[in-house]
Every structure is written in structure tokens, then in C-alpha cells.
Amino acid sequence: MNTIAPNLDGKHLRIGIVQARFTNEIGSEMLKVCCRTLQELGVADENITVATVPGALEIPIALMNFASSEKFDALIAIGVVIRGETYHFELVSNESGAGVSRVALDYNIPIANAVLTTENDAQAIERIEEKASDAAKVAVECANLVNLLLEEQFEDEE
């Protein structure tokens, strides 16, 4: 059996991050943690590009434009959706998540989805460190995996 080991070496990877500004205090902290973790994994600061958008529903369009540029090995979505008193929470959560997944599959690019969906601010704050750090690790690991699989695919065609 062939097994591909996880590779968390971010050296030479280019990462795009889209952060929703709605609930910006939490999102900004997530962005800091995410960027710090990427750098700890070896991603050069000049290889990290950050764009901000108004809210979670706008994340997929920015990700799509990053993906279509073919300048990135992986992308990261950062944001916070906190339940209110209306159905709007479900709409935003579901549509944002579906859009992120659609971009990843349509453009064959790994996207780490760190859009938190919580009941309140306290739950979101509690998850900042873990979820933002995890997103960086997922992006690096999946970028390396996809790059390796693409290399093997092209080697097989030769």
C-alpha cells in the first residue's frame, strides 16, 4: 500500500486569505493567528496575500478571483457568523460554506474554511486560536498534497 504522509512544510507555498470584516474584532484576531502559524510553518510573509470583504457572503467571490488567478497554492476563508434572532444566520452560514466548497472544487484548489458559526461572541472568542491555527495547517498540508498529486498525474502522462 502507498501512503502519502502529511507535509506541513510551507516553504515556497503561496497562500491567499479572505477575511470577512463583519465581527471584525474576532476576524482580525483570527487573521493574526493564522498568519503567525503560516509563518511558523515556513510560508514567507511575501507569499501571503490578504483581502478583506464586508461579510461572510462575500467571501466566495473573493476566493473565486484568487483561485482564477492561479497565483496561489491554497486559500483560507476567515470570518464569524453569530446566531441572531432570525433565520438569517442559517442563510449566511449555509450559503457561505457552500460557496467556499464550490470554489475549491471548481478550481481544484484547497480552501481551509475558518468561518466560525457560533451562538454568541464568547463561543467565537474561545475558538479563535485553535480554528485559525488549524486553518493555516490545513491550507499548507492540503496545498502540498494537491501539488504532489498533480505532479504525479503529469509524470504518469509523460
Curated annotation (Swiss-Prot):
Q: What catalytic activity is recorded? A: (2S)-2-hydroxy-3-oxobutyl phosphate + 5-amino-6-(D-ribitylamino)uracil = 6,7-dimethyl-8-(1-D-ribityl)lumazine + phosphate + 2 H2O + H(+)
**Record has Nucleotide-binding as a keyword:** no
- At which positions is 5-amino-6-(D-ribitylamino)uracil bound? 22, 56-58, 80-82, 113
Citing just one GO molecular function, the answer is: 6,7-dimethyl-8-ribityllumazine synthase activity
**Pfam families hit by this protein:** DMRL_synthase (PF00885)
Which InterPro entries does the protein's record reference? LS, LS/RS, LS/RS_sf
Tell me the pathway: Cofactor biosynthesis; riboflavin biosynthesis; riboflavin from 2-hydroxy-3-oxobutyl phosphate and 5-amino-6-(D-ribitylamino)uracil: step 1/2
Q: Which HAMAP family does the entry mention?
A: Lumazine_synth
Record protein name field: 6,7-dimethyl-8-ribityllumazine synthase
Species this chain originates from:
Neisseria meningitidis serogroup B (strain ATCC BAA-335 / MC58)
The gene for this chain is ribH
